[in-house]
Amino acid sequence: MEVYKKINNNVALARDAKGRELVVFGKGIGFASMPYELTDLSRIQRTFYDVNEKYLALLRDVPEAVFLAADDIADTAREELDCTLNANLTYALADHLNFAIQRSREGLNVQVPLAYDIQHLYPHEYAIAKQGLHELCRTLAVDLPDTEIVSIAMHIITAENEVGDMHSTILTAKVISELSAI
């Protein structure tokens, strides 16, 4: 694997054996002078393919721990919802969570008017978001308000809809059906 661009000491851009671009995470991955051939692939902790260009700058601005927590939430959503999610969910979540942590430190609290609706119309996404937020707060020793559960859930819902999978279509039809019954 050729590592060719440093993002920071632990994150870099690379090309795999097939020439596909990816982002690699690992202790000291970006420390060596670029470019170089990475032969010990066990040094890689995580890889990300199909990264949108606009999200690459986030890798410099968002702390690695926040990024990895966002990726854990995205992984849980992929596993538990058993559907394809937009490949950039991790980046969108990392950006949001980093900003939420900054707002929290400044004492700013944002209200989310759709909280009740999201919780009841998307219970699986809400549960994943709730679990993810509590794990993030525990791991990073931060205190974020429960309103962030809804924001995280909305990112997951958006990631479902951006790929246009059958799960989203069925869910939308179900919601419309329930609303029609009222």
How does the language model describe each region?
Residues 1-182:
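A cross-family "folded-core" feature that marks the main globular domain of proteins
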